[in-house]
A protein has these predicted regions:
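Structured loops at beta-to-helix junctions and adjacent beta-edge loops in soluble globular domains
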Residues: 6-8, 22, 73
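Intrinsically disordered, low-complexity peptide-like regions
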Residues: 2, 23, 41-43
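Low-complexity intrinsically disordered segments
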Residues: 31, 37-83
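Short, extreme N-terminal segment that most often corresponds to the first beta-strand
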Residues: 1-18
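A short, structured beta-strand/loop element
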Residues: 16-39
Length: 83
């Protein structure tokens, strides 16, 4: 699946990632924070249980349910490891 990848910095210099199917807007319920485009039209295997290096769990299920998939607060990426 081709997706657009957004990133935002959280507390303690850790990053969260949000992916949406290519060309789709971030849904309104997730658009209230400062997301920055990281990459556009990236091929990812959304069938994976865990999408590394963005640390997103169950991307296919999240996209089906919400229209996007996001890094859990438990898996935020430290700045030195952030893609």
């Amino acid at each position: 699946m081709k997706v657009d990848i957004y990133r935002r910095e959280g507390p303690q210099q850790k990053f969260s990632y949000l992916i949406v199917p290519q060309g789709q807007d971030i849904p309104p319920e997730a658009d209230n924070v400062d997301w920055h485009v990281r990459q556009l039209a990236v091929d990812v295997d959304e069938t994976q249980e865990h999408l590394h290096p963005y640390e997103i769990d169950n991307p296919r299920a999240q996209i089906a349910e919400k229209g996007y998939a996001i890094t859990s607060v438990y898996h935020q990426v430290p700045a030195q490891a952030a893609p």
